């Protein structure tokens, strides 16, 4: 079993960052489960714990020069990862500013290999948009990293751009880890997996 998934199960439960019900995602689809990574930085010890996992996972990624956060949720994770890895930081806005220098990409990225960071990947549309903006700014996006991959097309979408997506765990792995840890009843986990992916645990 993915050790990151086991650790994340503890973090998500302790932080109150995993919720069950009916939620509309940024992709427009609905989901019976929601991962709210935005709340984790409010718990410094848990925040540090997840950042440590990301820093360790960075060892799997080919050499990168700059860590780039996707606004807004990805910026705080990219900032922590940049500090731990002692790499420069930049970030990508969802749209161009209408004042000041009117930039989409903030930070020095031209001619540099960059890692794009976000909290959760669903379809990968936000990450793909960031990759496009970074290329327009003269950067070379070589990889992307998220804490949780919901397995709804992000890996494939980024592969179309020649960018590999790394994640600490998939949502499926986290659900399984929650069963192993005793946080979730196996029958409920099977129901969730069936709703999400049309299959059993």
Swiss-Prot record:
Q: What's its job? A: Catalyzes the transfer of a ribosyl phosphate group from 5-phosphoribose 1-diphosphate to orotate, leading to the formation of orotidine monophosphate (OMP).
The Swiss-Prot or TrEMBL record lists the needed cofactor(s) as:
Mg(2+)
E.C. number, please? 2.4.2.10
Task: Please list the residues that bind 5-phospho-alpha-D-ribose 1-diphosphate.
Answer: 93, 97, 99, 118-126
**Subunit annotation:** Homodimer.
Please give one Pfam family short name.
Pribosyltran
Instruction: Describe the reaction catalysed, as an equation.
Output: orotidine 5'-phosphate + diphosphate = orotate + 5-phospho-alpha-D-ribose 1-diphosphate
Which GO molecular function terms does the record list? magnesium ion binding; orotate phosphoribosyltransferase activity
Q: Which residues bind orotate?
A: 122, 150
Pathway(s) per entry: Pyrimidine metabolism; UMP biosynthesis via de novo pathway; UMP from orotate: step 1/2
Q: Which UniProt keywords apply?
A: Glycosyltransferase, Magnesium, Pyrimidine biosynthesis, Transferase
Annotated source species: Hyperthermus butylicus (strain DSM 5456 / JCM 9403 / PLM1-5)
In Swiss-Prot or TrEMBL terms, this protein is called Orotate phosphoribosyltransferase
Give start-end of the signal peptide. Answer: none
Key word Transferase present:
yes
Homology family: Belongs to the purine/pyrimidine phosphoribosyltransferase family. PyrE subfamily.
Task: List, alphabetically, the HAMAP family matched.
Answer: PyrE
Which GO terms are recorded in the biological process aspect for this UniProt protein? Answer: 'de novo' UMP biosynthetic process; pyrimidine nucleobase biosynthetic process
């Amino acid at each position: 079993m993915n050790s990151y998934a086991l650790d994340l199960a503890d973090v998500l439960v302790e932080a109150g960052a995993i919720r069950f019900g009916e939620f509309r995602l940024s992709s427009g689809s609905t989901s019976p489960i929601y991962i709210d990574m935005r709340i984790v930085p409010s718990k410094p010890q848990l925040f540090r714990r997840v950042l440590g996992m990301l820093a360790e996972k960075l060892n799997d990624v080919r050499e990168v020069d700059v860590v780039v956060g996707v606004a807004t949720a990805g910026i705080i994770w990219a900032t922590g990862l940049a500090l731990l890895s002692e790499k420069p930081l930049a970030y990508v806005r969802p749209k161009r500013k209408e004042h000041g220098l009117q930039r989409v990409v903030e930070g020095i990225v031209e001619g540099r290999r960059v890692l794009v960071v976000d909290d959760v990947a669903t379809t990968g549309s936000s990450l793909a948009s960031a990759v496009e903006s970074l290329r327009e700014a003269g950067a070379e996006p070589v990889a992307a990293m998220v804490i949780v991959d919901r397995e709804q097309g992000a890996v494939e979408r980024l592969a179309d751009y020649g960018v590999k997506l790394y994640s600490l765990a998939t949502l499926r792995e986290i659900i399984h880890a929650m069963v192993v840890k005793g946080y979730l009843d196996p029958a409920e986990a099977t129901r969730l997996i069936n709703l999400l992916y049309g299959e059993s645990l």
